[in-house]
């Protein structure tokens, strides 16, 4: 069963720079950041009051550069952890444009840049933000792998590519309680505004009734023509798994390929803390 889109003709999305021709500003401009209320998606998921999960959106910033006090360029790799309890998520194109505005701006040192990022991002998200910046000599993002078993090699026939949570109906086996970790690299959704493809991998760690792997894979593949932001997709997966399969403990963590020098990696759980950053092979 498909769900009605809460986004169609929504005025909260009308003024986003995403999907529009924009000028690239090279002088520090925090006003370029644009928020999107998280509640826009959560209302459609019937999430009000206390959330059934905690977590964060872990962004990796690959293209950040500024000038030191002598005018010499500095480059770094950054991480921004945006609490899932913040009022807003940050729209990714506006984040890219904001980072570009550092390019011709002088900063005293790396700590000043980090503080500036935290201050601006916290204001936009209206929530807690933690930022780390690393000189390239100290950045150690080794290519890793997701834990658990990959379900992508299941030999199944797929002829439906429209999103539906119905694939998860009766997917939980209440007679068999397990703790297991499953992952898939077949997650694909599309940008909510532009329709451009978003490629991701997702890992699901749960304790509860054993989830039918074929049904889970069909469900994940059904995102293939679904238009939603990364963060919203992960929260939808969490809520659908919890609603249909009723695990006692659940973690959903996705890592998406980068666009515009940024990758977004949403983490949601009711029992675990967010992991250290890493890179998958496609990142």
From Swiss-Prot:
GO biological process, one term: tRNA modification
Molecular function per GO: preQ1 synthase activity
Residues passing through the membrane, by range: none
List of residues binding NADPH: 92-93, 259-260
Origin superkingdom: Bacteria
Keywords, in A-Z order: Cytoplasm, NADP, Oxidoreductase, Queuosine biosynthesis
Cellular component, GO, one term: cytoplasm
EC number, UniProt record: 1.7.1.13
Catalytic residues (UniProt): 191, 198
InterPro entries cross-referenced by the UniProt entry: GTP-CH-I_C/QueF, NADPH_dep_7-cyano-7-deazaG_red, QueF, QueF_N, QueF_type2
Compartments, as annotated in UniProt: Cytoplasm
Binding site for substrate: 90-92, 230-231
Catalytic activity: 7-aminomethyl-7-carbaguanine + 2 NADP(+) = 7-cyano-7-deazaguanine + 2 NADPH + 3 H(+)
Primary enzyme class: oxidoreductase
Chief localization: cytoplasm
Pathway assigned in UniProt: tRNA modification; tRNA-queuosine biosynthesis
Keyword Chaperone found: no
Sequence similarity: Belongs to the GTP cyclohydrolase I family. QueF type 2 subfamily.
Function: Catalyzes the NADPH-dependent reduction of 7-cyano-7-deazaguanine (preQ0) to 7-aminomethyl-7-deazaguanine (preQ1).
Subunit-level organization: Homodimer.
Entry-linked HAMAP family: QueF_type2
Protein name per its UniProtKB record: NADPH-dependent 7-cyano-7-deazaguanine reductase
Taxonomic source organism: Tolumonas auensis (strain DSM 9187 / NBRC 110442 / TA 4)
Lineage per the UniProt record: Bacteria, Pseudomonadati, Pseudomonadota, Gammaproteobacteria, Aeromonadales
